[in-house]
Amino acid sequence: EDLSLVGQPENDYDTGDDBTAADPDSNNTAAALDVRRPLPSGTRVRRPPLRHRRLAPGAVMSRDPPASPRPQEAQKAIRDEGGCMLPESDLGVLCPTGCELREELLKQRDPVRYKISMLKQNLTYFINSFDRMASDSNTLKQNVQTLRRRLNSRSSTHVNAQKEIENRYKEVKIRIESTVAGSLRSMKSVLEHLRAKMQRMEEAIKTQKELCSAPCTVNCRVPVVSGMHCEDIYRNGGRTSEAYYIQPDLFSEPYKVFCDMESHGGGWTVVQNRVDGSSNFARDWNTYKAEFGNIAFGNGKSICNIPGEYWLGTKTVHQLTKQHTQQVLFDMSDWEGSSVYAQYASFRPENEAQGYRLWVEDYSGNAGNALLEGATQLMGDNRTMTIHNGMQFSTFDRDNDNWNPGDPTKHCSREDAGGWWYNRCHAANPNGRYYWGGIYTKEQADYGTDDGVVWMNWKGSWYSMRQMAMKLRPKWP
């Protein structure tokens, strides 16, 4: 749907900071950044040197060699947390990225908009033509009146000329009136056709929204192998990247996740994924706490090995980190085909009572240390206010950011279009608005802020990623 600029907001960063400077290696200058929201003091982060390794063979939790195939047992029907119906007890269920009907509607949107635009242009043309004809008629009438006055003052020899002019005036008037009437009829017909078409579109959109709001059911077989998390499944023999059931503890019911068994050694539980903009990430606190989106969909061969667009839930993310210290991996790709990553050896959100406050340590990768160091293009307080470590989770209805706490007009989540661990406001915004093509502008954003799927240390404020995924894996001692 079309978005309009609500208003020109205040700059998010302190443009008067004397120590703001541009990073020569960045693709974006400081002038292109959203310099805003000054912070009186910085954040000091203690980063103890951490290393991690997998257990040696024979030790506890070591990866066993792949077990010999066993006869496949009938899989127990498990209650689906996503709301889909299990067609059979031995079939898994996973929801696709988007419904086919929604995709078809999106394909038809641009042609319909183009036709509407052309109809509007025709309407404008008819209105302008009518105005010109009305102006011409008034001018002609004035000329006739002038001539009449002149003829009245002259001799009777000019009476015939006067009658001829009047007759011609009547002819022109009749012609103009008939033309205007025809134009008005044409305009009325066009408007009625346009109104009917828009009504049909509104009804179709309403129907598609109702269909797409319900979880979609797919006939994908979920592998029998399971575990506490994807790393556990990897050690139990699961080697393909697809949807699995996990059960982090005995007190919780199993639920579906997408496991990345290939990237950076495999065993990653994907807790967030952005691929096509099919899911709206501007959600409230309770929705982020639970789960939303589509975990995965099939490839036509009854295998759910294509990840969808979703958020696994802050409650679930916290649950995964209670049993083991977790690493976090951010994989991202741009619209030109390049990919980078950012990995942190320790990732720990606190519980809901603490606002799921985030703590990360020990960065590695080539995307830039956005969570611990903030946006490297900025300096001083402008940079400090973009650090995410130590921040609470915020949504548009739960303002926990560090931007003038208590002031409802200063709200990062509302302006940046997603839920995240905002400071004042961000160097990374994985849950922001999805923009096709990468580059976007202030005019496209609702509040004029950099609200895209952003990782500033790689592509700056005004480039939205094509793909962004957040993955967890236990860090073994």
Curated annotation (Swiss-Prot):
Name used for this protein in its record: Fibrinogen beta chain
Database matches in SMART domains: FBG, Fib_alpha
Sites bearing Sulfotyrosine, chain numbering: 13
Biological process annotations from GO: blood coagulation, common pathway; fibrinolysis; platelet aggregation; positive regulation of heterotypic cell-cell adhesion; protein polymerization
InterPro entries with a match to the protein in the record: FIB_ANG-like (IPR037579), Fibrinogen-like_C (IPR036056), Fibrinogen_a/b/g_C_1 (IPR014716), Fibrinogen_a/b/g_C_dom (IPR002181), Fibrinogen_a/b/g_coil_dom (IPR012290), Fibrinogen_CS (IPR020837)
Modifications made to the protein after synthesis: Conversion of fibrinogen to fibrin is triggered by thrombin, which cleaves fibrinopeptides A and B from alpha and beta chains, and thus exposes the N-terminal polymerization sites responsible for the formation of the soft clot. The soft clot is converted into the hard clot by factor XIIIA which catalyzes the epsilon-(gamma-glutamyl)lysine cross-linking between gamma chains (stronger) and between alpha chains (weaker) of different monomers.
Disulfide bonds: 220-304, 230-259, 412-425
